[in-house]
Regions:
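Secretory targeting signals
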Residues: 1-16, 40-108, 125-126, 133, ...
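Terminal transmembrane helical anchor/hairpin motif
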Residues: 73, 114-189, 193
Length: 193
């Protein structure tokens, strides 16, 4: 269910980010002297914050449902561990949304950006399943594609192989920040139609 939650967040992010650019209402803000980079970062931070909070609520709802169904009351340390894992998964979600926001700046088409991101996620899962038994023999571009794909993280996380993927979290975090910075630079140079 997590991959489909990303798709919902992806659609939300692309629609919210490109709405003002498509309708032309952003020209008013720029005409009043607001810098394009300020508008870009405000929208991006809003999208990322709402997505992270929504994801944590989503996980908490499933956690409560599971407690009610099973009757098991977790200890405080177990609940804290779950929150930590949910936050770690949230970091990967934010990196994925950073990709979609960056593509929105470059392409400015909701359908194309959503299509590219969906293909990226689901092809990442397919390629990883084809290569997982022999990842050492895979070419460097394929390794970069697989390790940089959010499905690699979540497929390992869901199969309880968490020790090898924790080291990838800084990559997702720094990659997301880098994409947001590059997107801000691209937005400052882009002409608003």
């Amino acid at each position: 269910y997590t991959a489909f939650f990303w798709i919902v967040c992806l659609v939300f992010a692309t629609i919210f980010f490109t709405k003002e650019y498509n309708t032309g209402t952003i020209k008013l803000s720029v005409a009043y002297g607001t810098k394009r980079t300020i508008l870009y970062y405000t929208k991006a931070i809003t999208i990322l914050a709402v997505s992270l909070i929504t994801y944590l609520i989503f996980v908490a709802a499933f956690f409560v449902i599971e407690i009610i169904q099973s009757g098991y009351i977790p200890s405080a340390s177990e609940a804290l561990t779950l929150f930590g894992w949910a936050l770690a998964c949230g970091i990967v979600l934010l990196a994925f949304e950073s990709i979609s926001i960056f593509l929105c700046v470059i392409i400015q088409n909701i359908g194309v950006v959503t299509g590219i991101c969906c293909l990226y996620v689901f092809s990442g899962a397919s390629v990883y399943l084809m290569l997982w038994s022999n990842m050492d023999a895979a070419s460097i571009p394929l390794k970069i594609f697989v390790y940089g794909n959010p499905m690699y993280y979540w497929m390992n996380f869901c199969s309880c192989r968490t020790m090898g993927i924790i080291e990838h979290l800084p990559f997702y975090f720094m990659g997301g920040i880098l994409l947001l910075i590059v997107g801000g630079i691209a937005m400052s140079k882009k002409e608003i139609k």
